[in-house]
C-alpha cells in the first residue's frame, strides 16, 4: 500500500528480476536469488499486472496461452515440449473454476476476451503450476467493480488452496486491510508501517 512513486512497483521489479539491486539480498525460501536471471525466476515467480492486456498473447488461443504458461513454469526442459491430453484436461478443469464458460472456448483467440475474462485467464496462467511467490500489481484496478470482486475472490481461493506466498500492491485501503495477514505501507522506497493481523482488526479505512 502507498501512493504513486512510493516504490511499490520498483520493489516488485527487483523481486521479479527486471533489474539488479544495488545493495542487499533477495531471498526466496532461504535461497539467494539476488543475481538469478529474470527468465529463471519466472519459473517460480508468478506475476499479474494492472493492465489485462499484459501477460497473454492476444493472437493465440486460450489453449495455446495456457500451454505456454504450463510449459514455461513446469519441469519441461526441451524447447519443443508438447502438452499431453491429460494436460489439456487440466486446462479445462482450471478454466471451469472461473464459471464463465471459457472451458468450452479453448480455441478462441485471447484478444477477443473482455478485460475481466482476460485477467481471469492471466491469473490461471500465473498459477497453473503453483509458484513459490505470486506478485499482484494492482491486478483488479482496471476492471469494473463486479469483475474486480470476482477476480479477488478467485485470487484468494487459489492462494489459500495452494498455500502460495503472495504480495499484492493496491491503492485501495479497504482491500489492503481485508486481504492477507500483513499490510505494509510504503513511502519514498521505504516501509513506514507494518501491520499484522491483530493490528488490521483494530483498523478501518477511516483510521
What are these regions (language model features)?
Residues 60-72:
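Q-loop/switch helix immediately C-terminal to the Walker
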Residues 32-46, 54, 77, 84, ...:
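ABC ATPase NBD coupling module
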Residues 170-171:
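H-loop/switch region of ABC-family ATPase nucleotide-binding domains
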Residues 128-132:
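A short, proline-enriched helix->beta-strand linker immediately N-terminal to the Walker B motif
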Residues 16:
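Helix-to-loop junction immediately C-terminal to a conserved catalytic motif
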Amino acid at each position: 500500500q502507498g501512493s504513486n512513486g512510493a516504490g511499490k512497483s520498483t520493489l516488485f521489479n527487483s523481486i521479479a528480476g527486471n533489474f539488479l539491486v544495488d545493495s542487499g539480498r533477495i531471498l526466496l525460501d532461504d535461497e539467494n536469488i539476488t543475481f538469478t536471471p529474470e527468465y529463471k525466476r519466472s519459473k517460480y515467480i508468478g506475476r499479474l499486472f494492472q493492465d489485462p492486456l499484459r501477460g497473454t498473447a492476444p493472437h493465440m488461443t486460450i489453449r495455446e496461452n495456457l500451454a505456454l504458461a504450463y510449459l514455461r513454469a513446469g519441469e519441461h526442459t526441451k524447447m519443443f515440449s508438447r502438452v499431453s491430453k491429460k494436460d489439456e484436461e487440466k486446462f479445462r478443469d482450471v478454466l471451469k473454476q472461473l464459471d464463465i464458460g471459457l472451458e468450452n472456448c479453448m480455441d478462441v483467440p485471447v484478444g477477443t476476451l473482455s478485460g475481466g475474462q482476460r485477467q481471469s485467464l492471466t491469473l490461471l496462467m500465473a498459477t497453473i503450476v503453483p509458484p513459490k511467490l505470486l506478485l499482484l500489481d494492482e491486478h483488479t484496478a482496471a476492471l469494473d467493480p463486479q469483475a474486480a470482486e470476482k477476480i479477488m475472490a478467485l485470487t484468494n481461493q487459489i492462494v489459500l488452496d495452494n498455500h502460495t506466498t503472495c504480495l499484492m500492491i493496491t491503492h485501495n485501503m479497504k482491500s489492503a486491510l481485508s486481504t492477507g495477514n500483513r499490510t505494509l505501507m510504503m513511502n519514498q522506497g521505504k516501509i513506514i508501517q507494518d501491520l499484522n493481523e491483530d493490528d488490521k482488526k483494530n483498523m478501518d479505512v477511516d483510521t
